[in-house]
């Protein structure tokens, strides 16, 4: 798909997806369709092992495009169709076979906050802030995403007040892996991405699948799935190469097989 609202670059097994819809990277229908198509593509690409999601401008993503939303005609099913597209965008990030690192350069609000919470790892610049301001425009949403990262009382506070929370607070709560100066955001995100890209791509993908699969399971059921994946991995060429490299005291050369 030709990209109008996104930029995609791939280098050394790392894909960088950049939101590029000025002025605030609001999620209109067009950019949602591009996000869905792009993450579906990255899911299948053998030359990609890690994805970095970031944005151009001072705002990471201001959330849904309210101006576009109020222009909906009221056609039966229209709102549900748009919401389904939104869900599929989120699922395409969560279910992408490659780890996704959010490099948040500014405000991430509403659906913009939600899409960062779909990522596997989050890094933010010092001036970034996060919030779910749907209540301020007479809407509601984001409950399930916040439940994955916040206590019930913290999630209720964010949802009921629409308050914005600075990056430093989310780092204190363990939601963010790092908060860095703006000039260091992409270098740090790329450093982390390259570190992960050096690992066995099969093992990394299995780890992500396991995390997603066991998140809401009992300890017994979750551990069984994890063990099954480990057995499957042990038969791979990458696992054999890693063992041989350990014996020979050299770095393994992974092929993703």
Question: Where would I find each of the regions flagged by the language model?
Answer:
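Terminal peptide-recognition signature
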Residues: 17, 35, 53, 65, ...
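Conserved CoA-thioester-binding segment of acyl-CoA-metabolizing enzymes
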Residues: 1-56, 91
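Beta-strand-connecting loop/turn residues
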Residues: 12-13, 58, 128, 228
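Crotonase-fold acyl-CoA enzyme core
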Residues: 92-202, 228, 235-236, 241-244, ...
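A secondary-structure boundary/capping signal
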Residues: 20, 54-56, 62, 105, ...
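Glycine- (often His-adjacent) and acidic-residue-rich active-site loop
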Residues: 33-34, 55-92, 108, 218
């Amino acid at each position: 798909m030709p990209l109008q609202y996104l930029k995609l670059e791939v280098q050394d097994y790392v894909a960088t997806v950049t939101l590029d819809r000025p002025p605030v990277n609001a999620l209109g229908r067009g950019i949602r369709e591009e996000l869905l198509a792009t993450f579906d593509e990255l899911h299948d690409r053998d030359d990609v092992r890690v994805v970095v999601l970031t944005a151009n401008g001072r705002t990471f993503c201001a959330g849904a495009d309210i101006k576009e939303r109020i222009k909906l005609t009221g056609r039966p099913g229209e709102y549900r169709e748009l919401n389904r597209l939104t869900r599929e965008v989120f699922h395409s990030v969560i279910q992408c076979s490659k780890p996704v690192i959010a490099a948040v350069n500014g405000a991430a609000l509403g659906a913009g906050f939600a899409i960062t919470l779909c990522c596997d790892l989050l890094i933010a610049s010092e001036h970034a802030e996060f919030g779910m301001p749907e209540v301020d425009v007479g809407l509601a949403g984001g409950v399930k995403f916040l439940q994955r990262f916040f206590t019930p009382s913290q999630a209720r506070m964010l949802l009921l007040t629409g308050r914005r929370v600075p990056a430093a607070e989310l780092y204190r709560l363990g939601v963010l892996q790092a908060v860095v100066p703006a000039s260091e955001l992409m270098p740090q995100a790329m450093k982390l991405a390259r570190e992960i890209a050096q690992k066995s791509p099969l093992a990394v993908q299995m780890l992500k699948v396991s995390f997603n699969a066991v998140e809401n399971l009992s300890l017994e059921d979750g551990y069984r799935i994890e063990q099954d994946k480990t057995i499957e991995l042990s038969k791979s060429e990458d696992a054999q190469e890693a063992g041989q490299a350990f014996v020979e005291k050299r770095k393994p050369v992974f092929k993703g097989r």
